[in-house]
From Swiss-Prot:
UniProt KW keywords: Ribonucleoprotein, Ribosomal protein
Similarity comment: Belongs to the bacterial ribosomal protein bL33 family.
InterPro entries hit by this protein: Ribosomal_bL33, Ribosomal_bL33_sf, Ribosomal_zn-bd
Gene Ontology CC annotation, any one: ribosome
GO molecular function, one term: structural constituent of ribosome
Organism per entry: Streptococcus pyogenes serotype M1
Upper taxonomic lineage: Bacteria, Bacillati, Bacillota, Bacilli, Lactobacillales
Pfam families, per database record: Ribosomal_L33
Official protein name in the record: Large ribosomal subunit protein bL33A
GO terms for biological process, alphabetical: translation
PANTHER family, sorted: 50S RIBOSOMAL PROTEIN L33, CHLOROPLASTIC, LARGE RIBOSOMAL SUBUNIT PROTEIN BL33A
Amino acid sequence: MRVKINLECSECGSNNYLTSKNKSSHPEKIKVPKYCPKERKVTLHVET
């Protein structure tokens, strides 16, 4: 089952990305390095 998730910047707290994941095969939270336009650099984004 795929669910929609938000990715939140770990430094500034803004929700920058919307994605989906398969919850049955990946039950853990996603942590992905992505570009944050507010910080203007690549930061770690975590699932909210």
